[in-house]
Amino acid sequence: MSLIVDVYAREILDSRGNPTVEVDVTLEDGTLGRAAVPSGASTGAYEAVELRDKDTARYFGKGVKTAVAFVNGEIAEALMGIDATDQVGIDSAMIELDGTPNKSRLGANAILGVSLAVAKAAAEATGQPLYRYVGGTSARVLPVPMMNIINGGEHADNPIDIQEFMIMPVSADSIAEAVRMGAEVFHTLKKELSAAGLSTGIGDEGGFAPNLSSTRDALDFVLKAIEKAGYTPGEDIYLALDCAATEYFEDGRYEMKGEGKTLTPEANVDYLEALVNDYPILSIEDGCSEDDWEGWALLTERLGDRVQLVGDDLFVTNPARLAEGIQKGCANSLLVKVNQIGTLTETLSAVDLAHRNRMTCVMSHRSGETEDATIADLAVATNCGQIKTGSLARSDRLAKYNQLIRIEDELGETAIYAGRSILR
């Protein structure tokens, strides 16, 4: 039996210098599982609640000592002596202990830290890597990365409205080769931006944050970098966008202030369709606001057979929100962020629901990350086939790419890189 004998949380810092929760779970044989919780900048209104202290005299109110205290108190007491391999039972016990629909009492950051640390401890105790423990013997598909190389929106201090401009190296034969391709484009883009007299400072997720004039300006720079790196856009490498449209949706209109545009929901769909017509865009995330169900339905009707339409703020990794979206014909892909829902069990339920409804899934980081690489294992465990974990800079992003390379190496000849199989 892999019985829990200690649950201990501490306050550490994330990649933006803000406090977050780290949890250690120790089993009776001495096995330790450790997990650190990420945090988002552009957060959906329907996400599980991240508990902050709100003590302005400390970390400007962003401390997590309250969440830490809940882990070290109520949660630890409730889980002591429970078998760590009972993930569903443990997650259910924490949800019941919290007693709210959005984990607002104990905090999703407290609950998730424990949930992931339990899984990692159980995997270690059973002598399995995390991806195999969670995903079983079929867990061998390495995901195509969405590499965020230009940042805008809430992730950068520039006038670009769209939050992320990403590249997807689909022609690679392995995750190691995909990372190499991405790195080569990243370094080429840096040279191109520098030659144009633009900033090569990086944003929260490691992408560049130049003072570009428009979405198309950013896309043109990315295309040029792909070509100069020796690759063919739309063949070797595709483009992906995260609009994070909720961030600029005001009073029923899309206020793209960086470009001086005010768009109705229908005009917003027209805008995105024009981009798809002119650029090799494979995926668009949050092209409409989380509350614009009609806009989402129209976008899916117009582009759903050509482009992957990913729901992030729309679904917040919540099976109930996802079921509503499926019923309304909105989006065809689920972005998976473990801290949006707050437990591993609920995350896996959302992925299963998406797959059963023939939707794709994209495992994702948050803009506030740590060196914890759990999502790399989860991307393989769930056979997502795609992962968003930032650019080719910042160790908090590279930790995930490096873990994927290790997993691929460990799987050997049985490893499969998703590659072109994700194309629509």
UniProtKB/Swiss-Prot annotation:
Gene3D superfamilies: Enolase-like C-terminal domain, Enolase-like, N-terminal domain. It catalyses: (2R)-2-phosphoglycerate = phosphoenolpyruvate + H2O. Its EC number is 4.2.1.11. The keyword Cytoplasm applies. It holds the Pfam family Enolase_C. Its main location: cytoplasm. Pathway: Carbohydrate degradation; glycolysis; pyruvate from D-glyceraldehyde 3-phosphate: step 4/5. It is found in: Cytoplasm; Secreted; Cell surface. InterPro entries: Enolase (IPR000941), Enolase-like_C_sf (IPR036849), Enolase-like_N (IPR029017), Enolase_C (IPR020810), Enolase_CS (IPR020809), Enolase_N (IPR020811). Mg(2+) binds at D242, E285, D312. (2R)-2-phosphoglycerate binds at Q163, K337, R366, S367, K388. One of its GO terms (biological process) is glycolytic process. Keywords: Cytoplasm, Glycolysis, Lyase, Magnesium, Metal-binding, Secreted. This is Enolase. It comes from Dinoroseobacter shibae (strain DSM 16493 / NCIMB 14021 / DFL 12). The lineage of its organism: Bacteria, Pseudomonadati, Pseudomonadota, Alphaproteobacteria, Rhodobacterales. The gene is eno.
